[in-house]
């Protein structure tokens, strides 16, 4: 269990400055540079004090007060955490993984003697894409992605990543077996 160290000396204006800058940042949509803007605000508000910068960063990312604060400042800190922690976490996610797939949904339609799938993909950054496939295109896409996994297996990091998703791979195998048995 960690214990909080001495009371941190923070100028009261630091909280006002931090709040104003964060409101400005999040008044516009979150993008790839939003997290970097947040980091710059932290460093500017800390005025070169690394201990203060670390405290503010940890406070706003994880909601933790690593050191004691006077009662009034503790209330200001808690208010900033409530207002901005989730927004900052989303900004961090977008900065680190914005182009990754966040959600996929599909609808199947019958269209002139063939099944067509309307596949909607949503990225972490909120962008959405529509990918229309039929059975043949879907098989082509699966074949391509499987070949990418086989390629990843040849790389030590990729092999480790594949071991981490072994249950998913077993599930895929079972689905393929079910599909081929029913034909």
Swiss-Prot record:
Gene3D superfamilies: 1.20.58.1050, 6.10.250.1130
Native source organism of the sequence: Chlamydia muridarum (strain MoPn / Nigg)
Protein name (record): Uncharacterized protein TC_0873
Similarity comment: Belongs to the chlamydial CPn_0803/CT_584/TC_0873 family.
InterPro entries: CT_584-like
